[in-house]
């Protein structure tokens, strides 16, 4: 039986995408574990070994999709995308997925703490974590005020302090409570009118803020 391991990185941050990876190992790799238990240096070393010794695919769901569909469904979307890409390279019988209460389009089994128990999931967790960190660091120059390279978008005291000082961006997850508490209607309207966020996302955020829609007829 060919098993693909699937995991995500980035459900908790306030900024940027959630990243999912799917992995089928071709060779044994020593030192695989939940990416959160490994140092950055160890993750990077294992990352290079995994991509040499496996079939893999990586995908994301954006902050826009997280706001529209919620983080659980956005995670499922990212995982399905990764599995779809992987299946184009090699067929598999089942996907073992870290976590619980997920619903994917492919045959799958959820395994609680799977990133520590199943080597394929451990490998996927490492790929997802390394790629997500690289994505966030790539934004650091454009959004230098937020010091993304230090906290990777997570809700640290530093990140929240910098949001209060410099405001938000459309790449922040605007439906997350710590972010929404700092989001002004004026800013949201400016992004919508300038095309930086679309109508669907605008409506979703407004509905969670429990304020009237500005200039938009709700057709639901």
UniProtKB/Swiss-Prot annotation:
Keywords for this protein: Cytoplasm, Endonuclease, Hydrolase, Manganese, Metal-binding, Nuclease
Alphabetized GO MF terms: manganese ion binding; RNA binding; RNA-DNA hybrid ribonuclease activity
Co-factor requirement: Mn(2+); Mg(2+)
Swiss-Prot/TrEMBL catalytic activity: Endonucleolytic cleavage to 5'-phosphomonoester
Domain of life: Bacteria
CDD domains (UniProt xref): RNase_HII_bacteria_HII_like (cd07182)
Cofactor, free-text remark: Manganese or magnesium. Binds 1 divalent metal ion per monomer in the absence of substrate. May bind a second metal ion after substrate binding.
Pfam families: RNase_HII
Binding-site list for a divalent metal cation: 7-8, 98
Annotated compartments: Cytoplasm
Disulfide bonds: none
Leading EC class: hydrolase
One GO CC term, this protein: ribonuclease H2 complex
Positions of the RNase H type-2 domain: 1-191
One biological process term in Gene Ontology: DNA replication, removal of RNA primer
EC number: 3.1.26.4
Main location: cytoplasm
Function: Endonuclease that specifically degrades the RNA of RNA-DNA hybrids.
UniProt similarity note: Belongs to the RNase HII family.
Name of this chain's protein: Ribonuclease HII
Organism the protein comes from: Thermosipho africanus (strain TCF52B)
């Amino acid at each position: 039986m060919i098993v693909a391991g699937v995991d995500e990185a980035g459900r908790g941050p306030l900024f940027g995408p959630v990243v999912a990876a799917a992995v089928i190992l071709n060779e044994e790799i020593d030192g695989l574990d939940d990416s959160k238990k490994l140092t950055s240096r160890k993750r990077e070393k294992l990352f290079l070994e995994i991509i040499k010794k496996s079939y893999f695919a990586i995908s994301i769901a954006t902050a826009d999709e997280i706001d529209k569909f919620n983080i659980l469904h956005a995670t499922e979307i990212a995982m399905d995308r990764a599995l779809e890409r992987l299946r184009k390279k090699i067929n598999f019988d089942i996907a073992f997925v870290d976590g619980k209460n997920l619903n994917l389009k492919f045959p799958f089994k959820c395994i609680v703490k799977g990133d520590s128990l199943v080597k394929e999931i451990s490998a996927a967790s490492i790929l997802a974590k390394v790629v997500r960190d690289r994505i966030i660091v790539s934004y650091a120059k454009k959004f230098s005020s937020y010091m993304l390279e230090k906290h990777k978008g997570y809700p640290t005291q530093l990140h929240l302090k910098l949001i209060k000082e410099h405001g938000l961006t459309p790449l922040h997850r605007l439906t997350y409570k710590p972010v929404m508490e700092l989001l002004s209607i004026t800013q949201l309207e400016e992004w919508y009118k300038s095309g930086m966020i679309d109508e669907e996302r605008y409506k979703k955020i407004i509905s969670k803020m429990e304020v009237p829609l500005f200039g938009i007829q709700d057709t639901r």
